[in-house]
């Protein structure tokens, strides 16, 4: 079955996107990403060397752009201006690469998105030729506004970044999914494989995660688990779950037509 994820006109086999931070070293980063099967990897430009500093190890030596789609992000930015400046730098470092992940944070404690600044930055970046995937609140109205601006994917949080609390508001996610004409990917809050599966069962087009893998006791094994969870959740969504019944039990084994009855 051909069931690829298409973002900005490019198709991907994997619906799991992963971050590159918080690992003990680049070797563990590469091993975990290989185990995840991810094709899109996101990189915090303000925290990770992808060529800005010639004297430091370069992540692109471990994750070559020829094999992976590098998704620069604006983690650590708290204003639209900072986010735009950061992604313009990333475009220079990556030879005109246009696909980016925008996140503008509200405060350093919750890391909740600052939506007015996010909307402002998104509008500027889209006009500047970027293909913007955007981290946002689980607000259906603002998610639709980001789509209308021209973002190529909306990425509502499941819960706070790094919290591992899972999906706290599935109803809002479903509203966002039902109205969207661009891919919807859960971003932030996934803690374990069942969270990823639930996101996919709700109808999300993909899941992005970092801490859930990097802070697991065995990151490589957790990456493998997340790969399977995303695949299983997607298949369950496509298969269509049975209706929930709060009454009138329907036994798996029929009681009529039994031998000897």
UniProtKB/Swiss-Prot annotation:
Q: Which GO terms describe its cellular component?
A: cytoplasm
This protein's major location comes to cytoplasm
Keywords, sorted A to Z: Cytoplasm, Schiff base, Thiamine biosynthesis, Transferase
Q: Which pathway does the UniProt entry assign to this protein?
A: Cofactor biosynthesis; thiamine diphosphate biosynthesis
- Enzyme class, spelled out: transferase
Compartments, record wording: Cytoplasm
Q: Give its E.C. classification number.
A: 2.8.1.10
Tell me the GO molecular function terms: thiazole synthase activity
Can you cite a GO biological process for this protein?
thiamine diphosphate biosynthetic process
Q: Which of this chain's residues are annotated to bind 1-deoxy-D-xylulose 5-phosphate?
A: 162, 188-189, 210-211
Catalytic positions are 101
Q: How does it assemble?
A: Homotetramer. Forms heterodimers with either ThiH or ThiS.
What does it do? Catalyzes the rearrangement of 1-deoxy-D-xylulose 5-phosphate (DXP) to produce the thiazole phosphate moiety of thiamine. Sulfur is provided by the thiocarboxylate moiety of the carrier protein ThiS. In vitro, sulfur can be provided by H(2)S.
Q: Which family does it belong to?
A: Belongs to the ThiG family.
Q: What is this protein called?
A: Thiazole synthase
């Amino acid at each position: 079955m051909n069931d690829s994820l298409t973002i900005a006109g490019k198709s991907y086999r994997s619906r799991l996107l992963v971050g590159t931070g918080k690992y003990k070293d680049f070797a563990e980063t590469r091993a975990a990403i290989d185990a995840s099967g991810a094709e899109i990897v996101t990189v915090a430009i303000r925290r990770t060397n992808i060529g800005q500093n010639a004297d430091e190890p370069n992540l692109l030596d471990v994750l070559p752009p020829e094999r992976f789609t590098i998704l620069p992000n604006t983690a650590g930015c708290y204003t639209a201006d900072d986010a735009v400046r950061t992604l313009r730098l990333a475009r220079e470092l990556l030879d005109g690469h246009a696909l980016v992940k925008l996140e503008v944070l509200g405060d350093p404690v919750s890391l909740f998105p600052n939506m007015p600044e996010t909307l402002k930055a998104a509008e500027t970046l889209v006009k500047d030729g970027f293909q913007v995937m955007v981290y946002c609140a689980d607000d259906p109205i603002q998610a639709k506004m980001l789509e209308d601006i021209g973002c190529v994917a909306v990425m509502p949080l499941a819960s706070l970044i790094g919290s591992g609390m899972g999906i706290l508001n599935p109803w809002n996610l479903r509203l966002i999914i039902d109205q969207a004409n661009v891919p919807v990917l859960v971003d932030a809050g996934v803690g374990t494989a069942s969270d990823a599966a639930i996101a996919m069962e709700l109808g999300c087009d993909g899941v992005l995660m970092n801490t859930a893998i990097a802070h697991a006791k065995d990151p490589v094994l957790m990456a493998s688990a997340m790969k399977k969870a995303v695949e299983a959740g997607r298949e369950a969504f496509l298969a269509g779950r049975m209706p929930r019944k709060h009454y009138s039990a329907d036994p798996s084994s029929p009681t009529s037509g039994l031998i000897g009855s």
